[in-house]
């Protein structure tokens, strides 16, 4: 339940000192525009309803919103590289994968397997402290070695097939565990780049 609420997610990261953004606060706490921020729904997933507020005029227009449903989060510009990660915990089994990605309209179309001990350690810490039983999607950005986790989604993400093809088969492991109590073995993840494309087919 913690990760269904983006402000609770921020508080969890802050409390446990795990690469949290500078701020993720209810919109109604901001009385005057000062610096750019991302506008997000407090509850929700994906990039739907995200908007960059970078002028006083845009901020003024937010008066129309039900502010208790919205939040402001630190803005990351294009200097930051974006990563999508998955961590899975089933009984004593914990494993994770880190993918550097490129987006098109909010969807990952390119991903590259990355080895980063700091991120892997943080993912394990999140899984252990939250007493995870299943899979989490963790999104973060990095610039000048500064890591910032801006989203944690308690669900299978749209990169599930990419991960599967790379050897990280969290969806299958999850199903096998809950149906058959089968504990996965440590995966051999392919150190590859992967591209998602659309195909045209006759119907």
Language-model segments: residues:
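Protein kinase-like catalytic core scaffold
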Residues: 37, 94-95, 148-151
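Short, electropositive, low-hydrophobicity segments enriched in small/polar residues
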Residues: 48, 171, 184
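A short, glycine/Asx- and small/polar-enriched loop/turn
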Residues: 32-35, 143-148
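Cysteine/selenocysteine-centered motifs that mediate thiol-based redox chemistry or coordinate metal-sulfur cofactors
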Residues: 137, 181-203
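ATP-dependent carboxylate/phosphate-activation module, predominantly the ATP-grasp catalytic core
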Residues: 54-57, 67-69, 74-131, 135, ...
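Short gly/pro/ser/thr-enriched loop/turn and capping motifs at secondary-structure boundaries
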Residues: 1-3, 104-105
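Active-site nucleotide/adenylate-binding loops and adjacent lid/helix of ATP-dependent enzymes
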Residues: 2-80, 89-93, 117-121
């Amino acid at each position: 339940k913690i990760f269904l609420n983006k402000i609770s997610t921020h508080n969890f990261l802050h409390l446990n000192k795990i690469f949290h953004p500078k701020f993720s606060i209810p919109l109604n706490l901001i009385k005057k525009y000062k610096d750019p921020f991302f506008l997000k729904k407090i509850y929700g997933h994906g990039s739907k309803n995200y908007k960059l507020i970078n002028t006083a005029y845009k901020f003024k227009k937010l008066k129309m919103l039900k502010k208790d449903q919205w939040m402001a989060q630190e803005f990351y510009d294009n200097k930051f590289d974006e990563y999508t990660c998955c961590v899975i915990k089933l009984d004593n089994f914990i494993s994770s994968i880190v993918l550097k990605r490129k987006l098109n309209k909010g969807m990952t179309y390119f991903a590259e397997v990355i080895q980063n001990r700091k991120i892997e350690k943080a993912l394990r810490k999140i899984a252990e402290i939250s007493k995870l039983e299943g899979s989490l999607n963790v999104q973060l950005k990095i610039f000048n070695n500064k890591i910032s986790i801006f989203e944690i989604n308690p669900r299978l993400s749209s990169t599930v097939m990419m991960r599967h093809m790379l050897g990280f088969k969290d969806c299958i492991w999850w199903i096998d565990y809950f149906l058959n109590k089968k504990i996965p073995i440590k995966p051999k993840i392919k150190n590859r780049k992967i591209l998602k494309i659309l195909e045209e087919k006759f119907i």
